[in-house]
Amino acid sequence: MKEIKSGKRTRFSFGRVQAPIPVPNLVEIQTKSYQDFLENGILKVLKKFSPITSSKSDLRKEKGFSLEFVSVRVGEPQNTVQECKERLLTYTVPVYTTVRITDNSTNEMIEEEAFLGYLPYMTPRTTFIINGAERVVVNQLVRSPGIYFVEEPRKTSGTRPIYVAHFLPVRGAWLEILLNLNDEVFYARIDRKRRVNLFLLLKALGYSDDLKLLSLFPQWIDVDDEYTLMHSEGLVVLEDVKTKSGELIAKRGDVITQGLIEKLANSEIEKIKVAHRYAVNTLEKLKHTYGDDVEENRAYIEIFRKLRPGELPRINAAKIFLNNLYFNEERFELSEVGRFKMNNRLEEAYRKYLIDVEGKSPEEVEGVKYTETSNVLTPMDIVLASRNLIEIDKHPGTMDTKDHLGNKRVRTVGELIRIEFERAFSKAVFMIQEKLATYTSLDKISVQSLINVRSIIATINSFFATNPLSQFMDQTNPLAELTHKRRLTAVGPGGLKRERARFEVRDVHHSHYGRMCPIETPEGANIGLITSLSVYSTIDKYGFLITPYVKVVKGKVTDEIVYLTADEEENYKIAPSTTPVDEEGNIIPENVTVRYEEKVLYVSKYDVQFLDVAPNQIVSVSTSLIPFLEHDDANRALMGSNMQRQGVPLIETEAPRVGTGMEWEAAKYSGTLVLAKHDGIVKKVDANKIIIHRIDENGKEMYDSMGNPVLDTYELLKFTRTNQDTCINQRPIVNVGEVVKKDDPIADGPATDMGELALGKNVLVAFVPWEGYNFEDAILISEELLEKETYTSVHIEVYETTARDTRLGPEEITPDIPNVSKEKLRNLDEDGIIRIGAYVQETDILVGKVTPKSESDTTPEEKIIRSVFGEKGKEVKDSSLRVPHGIEGRVIAVHVFDKEKDGDLGPGVNKLIRVYVAIRKPLEVGDKLAGRHGNKGVVSKILPKEDMPFLPDGTPVQVVLSPLGVPSRMNVGQILETSLGWLAMLTNKWFATPVFDGAKEKDILPELYKARKKLGLEVGDDENNPTGKVTLRDGRTGLEFDHPILVGYMYVMKLIHIARDKIHARSTGPYSLIHQQPLGGKAQFGGQRFGEMEVWALEAYGAAHTLNEMLTVKSDDIMGRNEVYKAIMKGKNIPDPGLPESFKVLVRELRGIALDVRVYDSEGNEIDIEKL
């Protein structure tokens, strides 16, 4: 066991593997990507459209103007992050570009800086503030552009496969080359529409000579092989065939006949070069369809005819059409990534091409790379892809799998915003062009008026506000925040559709190892589509996920760290990080298990090429916080990972006694801690700020040139609301005079303790059934947890109201509210706004507001009052902001925004008032508790502590769990955690047990027995075979339970699913406008839906009157429910119900589809149902 520093705490770690590199910056992908967009991305987009000329036609080029973008400058944010949150603003920076305009006729030029617009700016916590709300842009996993060799799904069984080479661009038409083995012919499918003969396309691309075409697909026939020779009839000879004596048997271009086969069989010739059967068949089919005289122009016209039937084929139009599809950079873009992937994939085919077609030797082509740089397709790409299809026919195992991570790339924040910016700017380019054309001289041009800033800003803003990849940040706790920033999603624009995603896409793939977590993913419809990055994973310049490995040479581990993509990793044998290694770095065992491709092999240590860097390399941050993960079933580990993100920050935080060593890393990069920016000495600490005097490398205090001390001031956040209504409160954890190093924690945030993540509490648990109160995952808890406020959390709700201009005059914020008692107004100030510190309950007034009433219904008496008292006598309606049902708490802040002082608040709004109420939520029956192993349950009873089972020394346990929750769930990690937690408490230590490299049973139980023996708690356990169990006594009777019981300390969290927030009841409330039925849901103060199954239940009982009431007066019979109310008030019998509104709606809908529906009474008179 070794000591490790974790935040400001020391832990004892059971880990045996020392990772050669530290955990990387966990949010670096976001920051780097956005920074790259600002520094390079914007300019790249502008350069892409440069130069913009005033006229498209080449004739006037020398006369017009051309505009190009020289550089980009990013300004400073105008408001602070906190101001933007309070005033519901967007945190942005201004972007400027230097524009150069040249007069083409005189070559005169002007340079001027123009404003491009405001761009949302990333905060230091890698979030964006959009209209006051913190949002995160999630990384998207999409198919990489390039080339894929796949098999088309077979339509009927018994047919032979169709192999496809699929060119996938970033932008533009698809091209698919097909090898149909049913008729052994090559085809090209153009733009997912029509299939044409491949040779027709190749002829259009310049391969017009038939023999030249066939010689692209050569094959050697062994004359000694009788079977092959007999089956070569009909093939075309590609080289003159001569005997050793020089006699010419067959010329280049001859077709092999039966006679030639006999001649060849009787000669001494060993091999002949012929065209491949598939190529010959393709050419024959082409001739059969189009005749013998297909040259380049004819090929263009035939392709055009096929793709545009009905249009008159002209040669120029046909050429332009095909060139625009695949060979024009404006219409077709492979991108740098696509070209890189394609060159890599076709490298082997290119070498084979050089040997077969160009006659080079294997030695000459060894190591030769395919180095095409064009951003569009080339004829060579198409030839190599077609030739490779023949190889795929021979070796189907070399086909590509779509689900391999080597074929997927990550679109990061910067790239997603760049795509939007490019889209916005492409629209602006046309306007710039049009405006340029209107100017006649250079000195009259106003650069700023050329660029339409509005359309650019609008597109960017709509991306942040409406794109599914820009998400409202999950801020429940620091881990939720960190995980959200590291999320990968396969859905969204340009990605998969949730409904259409196959099982294979969602499944774990061997290429995910070390790149994507195989455990952390949602449980619902999104399972496998939304995932999380692994701890050490990062992204290369092309957007492919890479993960680090340690290089191994001849059985010895080196210091070299190599990052590999999923494609590169396929070629190496990689051993796990837990492989035993001696002090010199030599691998100890002679044979080692390694991963190679998708197999696990057992090889000599000298064959090992790489070693994993850490045992937790495979999992995400959330999952690597689960101790004893290796003892949990993956399904439960998934729940554990997801539920940690739902833990509510508690009033008093407590780090887990049994951690994994990742608690500090998770808290550090979550952005909720305050970290020291430089080395220094703490000079001042209070609840709101910390001041640190900087020191140099020698520990001396630093002063500036004026002799003033160089101070760093850290402002702390106090009781700030998060997106999920939890509370952010930062507390100092340093003292005056303390020396701090750079990146040391100096203040704790929500759910952190001494710099470590602290989502729950260490509580004493016992696994024993107790009177059925812990049946089916229910949890029995002790009153002690309430007395100590163990699971009490603070939540902050915000309520707002506006004073607007109405038709009848402005609304007024005032304490003078009609028909409200003084008692109700006692906490309002002179403006009618609640005072800070007031304790409020449901229906209390937070902001007094009155709205002018309509003049039409004034009585003569009111008119007299009006004429006497003027405006004061005006009738007003109470429209005050009140506390909603089920809420009680303390007002902690009030923000008032005035139109005159704070600028525009929106159309017609004069005042905006926001009231923040802090609500204390102790643990109650119905709240959800969970451990870190997917062991979740609901509190069923709170028992007095004297009734709880107790230990031999009289200590009552705090939580009683059902032992039946463990065996079937197979999350045994919780049992080991419980025992190690007890050992930690007894010895007052903090342990770290890293995932896949943690403590073993033999490390825990003997030590636990010794610690218990010292305190007399060993009753019920055996020294020779310790189990960690203890004899418990029932708190009510004092009698021992029949068997020893497992007891210990488990880390338990309170989740955001709080019963108090969900409980709801309605007697009377709002109704839906159309059907006049009660609304649904707590937010609308709605009722419970009485659905068809409930109707069946009442029908089964024969409760006719109850059923009638349910479907009419209690639902949507408007007149009926009013009559019932009157009858109840007057004490009369309840009248018969009328016609439900839903029936009227049905009749109206039938009339809407032109069906004339009428209603008649028993005597045949028509009834107007609107009056019923």
UniProtKB/Swiss-Prot annotation:
UniProt entry keywords in alphabetical sequence: DNA-directed RNA polymerase, Nucleotidyltransferase, Transcription, Transferase
The reaction(s) this protein catalyses: RNA(n) + a ribonucleoside 5'-triphosphate = RNA(n+1) + diphosphate
Domain of life: Bacteria
One GO MF term attached to the UniProt entry: ribonucleoside binding
GO biological process terms, semicolon-separated: DNA-templated transcription
InterPro entries referenced in this protein's UniProt entry, alphabetically: DNA-dir_RNA_pol_bsu_ext_1_sf (IPR042107), DNA-dir_RNA_pol_bsu_external_1 (IPR019462), DNA-dir_RNA_pol_su2 (IPR015712), DNA-dir_RNAP_su2_dom (IPR007120), DNA-dir_RNAP_su2_hyb_sf (IPR037033), RNA_pol_bsu_bac (IPR010243), RNA_pol_bsu_CS (IPR007121), RNA_pol_bsu_protrusion (IPR007644)
Enzyme Commission identifier(s): 2.7.7.6
Pfam name, any one: RNA_pol_Rpb2_2
Gene3D superfamilies with a match to the protein in the record: 2.40.50.100, 2.40.50.150, 3.90.1100.10, DNA-directed RNA polymerase, beta subunit, external 1 domain, DNA-directed RNA polymerase, subunit 2, domain 6, RNA polymerase alpha subunit dimerisation domain
Assigned GO CC terms: DNA-directed RNA polymerase complex
Binding partners and assembly: The RNAP catalytic core consists of 2 alpha, 1 beta, 1 beta' and 1 omega subunit. When a sigma factor is associated with the core the holoenzyme is formed, which can initiate transcription.
Family of this protein: Belongs to the RNA polymerase beta chain family.
Summary of the function given for this chain in its UniProt record: DNA-dependent RNA polymerase catalyzes the transcription of DNA into RNA using the four ribonucleoside triphosphates as substrates.
Protein name: DNA-directed RNA polymerase subunit beta
Organism: Thermosipho africanus (strain TCF52B)
Phylogenetic lineage: Bacteria, Thermotogati, Thermotogota, Thermotogae, Thermotogales
Gene behind the chain: rpoB
